[in-house]
Swiss-Prot record:
Name of the protein described by the UniProt record: Transaldolase
GO cellular component labels: cytoplasm
Organism of origin: Neisseria meningitidis serogroup C / serotype 2a (strain ATCC 700532 / DSM 15464 / FAM18)
EC number: 2.2.1.2
Gene Ontology molecular functions: transaldolase activity
Family per record: Belongs to the transaldolase family. Type 2 subfamily.
InterPro entries, A to Z: Aldolase_TIM (IPR013785), TAL/FSA (IPR001585), Transaldolase_2 (IPR004732), Transaldolase_AS (IPR018225)
Keyword Aminoacyl-tRNA synthetase: no
Swiss-Prot/TrEMBL keywords: Cytoplasm, Pentose shunt, Schiff base, Transferase
Main function: Transaldolase is important for the balance of metabolites in the pentose-phosphate pathway.
Active-site residues (renumbered): K138
Gene behind the chain: tal
């Protein structure tokens, strides 16, 4: 047992933000689950790195190139196999909690980020191809992605809504989720197995703001924003309106803290884990952050501490003329562009 068990007891899941064939086949992922990791996230950048650096893909790439497939079909064949293998490793965890943990995420193509119908069609296809009950389909939280979320939830598909930086957009996502649940209930279908995480990105906010802020606010605003988003979450899912869905089996969306590796070496390497521990949340961490947290992190319910201070820090930031919602829109666009570039790089050797 490690500190991860203590975090789980506080109501937070720690997931690994990484996936590769070697990670699964070496038994390393299974070992991480024994330590207390209870889920996995992937994205185009993670697969691009895996395909480029993991020798276990070489034979399959060569074989797939002999087949009459598009580069994207070759990528999907390998990515789906990796997600299936990770789902198998995480299945015992998933079943031990009645299907509440042990999820593995696979993202739709970044080029679909502004196409709701295209996102729905690809998400359905990928979910069917994986064929595992603990698979989650990752969808960017653009307006189109939030529209797709509603449809996918009504289809009974679990979703990881990603690239959230905005509290306003996050609240829109909760409403879309509730509409999808209501539609499914109205059709007489079960909703208890559907889980959605809202992936709220942390370190990129401080990375964008720290050069413009006074010293006493540096490294504070991303955490303040997350704490405010958690207050929003508590209010939304504590409402009588959602309670009516909950009594019919609906699960609450969980906030997932993403981008929690520290980008600024001046900050403690476990800053974005230690500071954001709270019930009904997830933190997905890169390998280095996971190792650091197991070694010297602190398991304490920090997410509800300093809520007033967080609001004061956000107010001071606004008084400096910084609109965090405008920043959120820019950071989401930047994130989409990064994933598009990673996807292009990933596909290039598969031509």
């Amino acid at each position: 047992m490690t500190i991860l068990s203590d975090v789980k007891a506080l109501g937070q899941q720690i997931w690994l933000d990484n996936l590769s064939r070697s990670l699964v086949q070496s038994g390393e992922l299974a070992q991480m689950l024994k330590q207390g990791v209870c889920g996995v996230t992937s994205n185009p950048a993670i697969f691009q790195k895996a395909f480029a650096g993991d020798a276990l893909y070489a034979d399959e790439v060569a074989a797939l190139k002999q087949q009459d497939l598009t580069p994207k079909q070759r990528y999907e064949t390998m990515a789906v196999a990796d997600v299936q293998a990770a789902c198998d490793v995480c299945l015992a965890e998933h079943e031990s909690t009645g299907g509440k943990t042990g999820f593995v995420s696979l993202e739709v193509s970044p080029e679909l980020s502004k196409d709701a119908q295209g996102t729905v069609e690809e998400a359905r296809r990928l979910y069917a191809a994986i064929g595992c009950k603990n698979a989650m389909i990752k969808v960017p939280a653009t307006d189109a992605g939030i529209d797709a979320l509603e449809t996918l939830v009504s289809d009974g598909i679990s979703v990881n809504l990603t690239l959230l930086f905005s509290r306003v957009q996050t609240l829109k996502a909760y409403a879309a989720y509730a509409r999808g649940i209501a539609k499914r209930l109205a059709a007489g279908q079960s909703v208890a197995h559907i889980h959605v995480v809202a992936s709220f990105f942390i370190s990129r906010v401080d990375g964008a703001l720290d050069t413009t802020l006074p010293d006493h606010l540096k490294g504070k605003i991303a955490i303040a924003l997350a704490k405010a988003a958690y207050q929003d979450w508590a209010q939304y899912f504590g409402s009588p309106e959602f309670a009516a869905l909950e009594t019919q089996g609906a699960n609450r969306v969980q906030l997932l803290w993403a981008s929690t590796g520290v980008k600024n070496p001046a900050y403690p390497d476990t800053l974005y884990v230690d500071s954001l521990i709270g019930a009904h949340t997830v933190n997905t961490v890169p390998d280095a952050t996971l190792k650091a947290f197991i070694d010297h992190g602190t398991a304490k319910a920090t997410l509800t501490e300093g809520a007033d201070e967080a609001q004061a820090q956000l107010a001071e930031t606004a008084a400096l003329g910084i609109d965090v919602e405008t920043l959120a829109a820019r950071l989401q666009e930047d994130g989409l562009k990064q994933f598009e570039e990673a996807f292009e790089k990933l596909l290039a050797p598969l031509v």
